[in-house]
Regions:
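Short connector loops at helix/strand junctions that flank enzyme active sites
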Residues: 41-45, 56-60, 90, 101-103
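A structural signal for short, well-ordered beta-strand segments and their strand-loop junctions
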Residues: 24, 60, 107-110
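Acidic-basic catalytic patches of nuclease active cores, encompassing PD-(D/E)XK
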Residues: 1-42, 53-54
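Helix-rich interaction surfaces within compact, conserved domain-sized segments
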Residues: 4-22, 125-181
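Conserved catalytic cores of phosphodiester-cleaving nucleases, focusing on short active-site segments
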Residues: 48-50, 57-68
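Short beta-strand-loop-alpha-helix junction that forms the active-site gateway
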Residues: 63-85
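Nucleic-acid nuclease catalytic cores
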Residues: 93-131
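Short, solvent-exposed loop/turn segments at secondary-structure junctions
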Residues: 30-32, 68-72, 114-117
Length: 181
């Protein structure tokens, strides 16, 4: 049985329109351990590269899912000995690095699962808005209200028996995150 994170990724992947190029960066085997002994292994900048050829937009996407009401993140000002959180320092910094390029949209995709009632809510947030939230909140976690307050955009989804289908065609065609260049 797949873990919920891989199942969310699989549902997200199945929701991508056929005319988009989607590439999953391969995780190293050490990426699945929680040990600090693997600090010298390759760390992917994000989970996916997605290209919308019709609009000429390249997305760098990091997907996160949780059953909790919040998502934790590591502080970028601290060294790598800090306790591990759901969003890692290198993921934040990598997405920030990609944001300097024209037509490149580095984003987080956040999925909140209410497992007791079988409902999921998913949002996409541009890294620039994430950084405003990061600096604006006086805590090392955020919830859905925080996300919405910092311009995260909800992705419409439908549950099909067990798995979700996310309407990414409509989402990508109607959102540009008002990226400042």
């Amino acid at each position: 049985m797949k873990n919920v994170g891989k199942r969310f990724e699989e549902n997200f992947k199945k929701s991508i329109p056929d005319e988009y190029l989607l590439y999953r960066l391969k995780d190293s085997p050490q990426a699945f351990t929680q040990s600090n002994l693997t600090s010298f292994t390759h760390k992917n900048p994000c989970d996916y590269f997605l290209f919308d050829g019709k609009r000429g937009i390249f997305y760098c996407l990091e997907l996160k899912t949780t059953k909790d009401k919040y998502i934790t993140f590591e502080k970028i000002e601290l060294d790598d000995t800090q306790p591990r959180k759901m969003i890692h320092k290198h993921q934040i910094l990598s997405l920030q690095e990609y944001s300097i390029y024209k037509n490149v949209y580095p984003c987080f995709v956040f999925n909140f699962r209410s497992e007791d009632i079988g409902i999921e809510r998913t949002y996409m947030q541009y890294i620039g808005d994430f950084m405003k939230m990061y600096h604006g909140l006086n805590k090392s976690s955020f919830n859905e209200i925080d996300l919405i307050s910092y311009n995260a955009v909800k992705i419409k989804g439908n549950k099909k028996r067990v798995n979700y289908y996310w309407n990414l065609t409509e989402f990508f065609e109607t959102n540009d995150f008002n990226k400042e260049k």
